[in-house]
From Swiss-Prot:
Record's GO cellular component terms: cytosol
Amino-acid positions noted as binding [4Fe-4S] cluster 2 in the UniProt annotation, renumbered to this chain: C239, C242
Subunit structure, as described in the record: Heterotetramer of 2 nubp1 and 2 nubp2 chains.
Organism: Dictyostelium discoideum
Taxon lineage: Eukaryota, Amoebozoa, Evosea, Eumycetozoa, Dictyostelia
Comment on bound cofactor: Binds 4 [4Fe-4S] clusters per heterotetramer. Contains two stable clusters in the N-termini of nubp1 and two labile, bridging clusters between subunits of the nubp1-nubp2 heterotetramer.
GO terms (BP aspect): iron-sulfur cluster assembly
Name of the protein described by the UniProt record: Cytosolic Fe-S cluster assembly factor NUBP1 homolog
GO molecular function, one term: ATP-dependent FeS chaperone activity
Keyword annotations: 4Fe-4S, ATP-binding, Cytoplasm, Iron, Iron-sulfur, Metal-binding, Nucleotide-binding
One Pfam entry name: ParA
Obligatory cofactor(s): [4Fe-4S] cluster
Domain of life per record: Eukaryota
Length: 315
């Protein structure tokens, strides 16, 4: 099981094969604790299947946030839409926010179902080169609650990675829930040997959000996930009448750029508030296409180009 760990074992670790694995005092606070406590002893054959399935995916990008409500899923969707605007580029969007799957609605795929073929689970397509998978496609009704403990969440994430037939992808964007929970440990564990490109971390400017983003950055550093960069979302509001910018969420400690400098991680840019972004998400449309000349679209595209450059130059 040692090849499944997401971080080096701590001092006084009882060992991955011990009956006290994940349960001793030395395990408290270790990123591997849940893995050691719940995983069966011995190698996990599913990891080999995941590695084989992921060989056809060139770039795998995690989208993270420390706190909920900062626009992470919106960012994931618009990144996927932007990448797929090149018809020669194949894009997948995987939603592992198990308890709050919003991607089907944002992508205009409400009411769609998963179909199984001889090659595995078929993702749902927005267009020929943009495929989506989410637990939301497994629910009978949109408002159905997903009340699962960690092991069941881990199981569905593993199934998404090893059983979904993505075919050849240039990019797989992975939308995660906020925080550093079971879903994050699982995705890092399962993709550890599959050349994870890195993580984009989304925040809003105020300090209450930045506190949790610092934790997210430390999580990535601890488990060995490369940080592509930090995005400050909801950064100011430009009045459509007078073009004057107002700060809705005041960056009292310098905002995401200052925090990125302090923590020595790349800062990718700022996206202003635009109520039409929320409307596009509610309607399941690409904001970049419906509002190509807006200031937010300009900033989105600058950030997306930086992400592509960083990911492609990291190989």
């Amino acid at each position: 099981m040692s090849d499944q760990l997401v971080a080096p074992p701590p001092e006084n670790c009882p060992g991955t094969q011990s009956e006290m694995s994940g349960k001793s005092a030395a395990c408290a606070g270790c990123p591997n604790q849940q893995i050691c406590a719940t995983a069966p002893k011995g190698p996990d054959p599913d990891i080999i299947e995941i590695e084989e399935r992921m060989k056809t995916v060139k770039n795998k990008i995690l989208v993270l946030s420390g706190k909920g409500g900062v626009g992470k899923s919106t960012f994931s969707s618009q990144l996927s839409f932007a990448l797929s605007m090149d018809e020669k580029v194949e894009v997948g969007l995987l939603d592992i926010d198990i308890c709050g799957p919003s991607i089907p609605k944002i992508m205009g795929l409400e009411g769609e179902n998963i179909h199984i073929s001889g090659q595995g689970w078929d993702p749902v397509y927005v267009q020929d080169n943009l495929a989506v998978m989410s637990v939301g496609f497994l629910l009978e009704k949109e408002e159905d609650a997903v009340i699962w403990r960690g092991p069941k969440k881990n199981g569905i994430i593993k199934q998404f990675l090893k059983d979904v037939y993505w075919n050849d992808l240039d990019y797989l964007v992975i939308d995660t829930p906020p925080g550093t929970s079971d879903e994050h440990l699982s995705i890092v564990q399962y993709l550890k040997t599959s050349n994870l490109s890195g993580a984009v971390i989304v925040t809003s400017p105020q300090d209450v959000a930045l506190i949790d983003v610092r934790k997210e950055i430390n999580f990535c550093k601890k488990v060995g996930v490369p940080i592509i960069g930090v995005v400050e979302n909801m950064s100011g509001f430009v009045c459509p009448k007078c073009n004057k910018e107002s700060q809705i969420f005041i960056p009292t400690t310098g905002g995401a750029e200052k925090m990125s400098q302090d923590m020595n991680v790349p800062f990718l840019g700022r996206i202003p508030i635009d109520p039409l972004i929320a409307r596009s998400c509610d309607e399941g449309k690409s904001y970049l296409i419906t509002h190509p000349n807006s200031e937010a679209t300009k900033q989105y595209n600058l950030i997306f180009n930086k992400i592509k450059e960083i990911v492609n130059n990291s190989k």
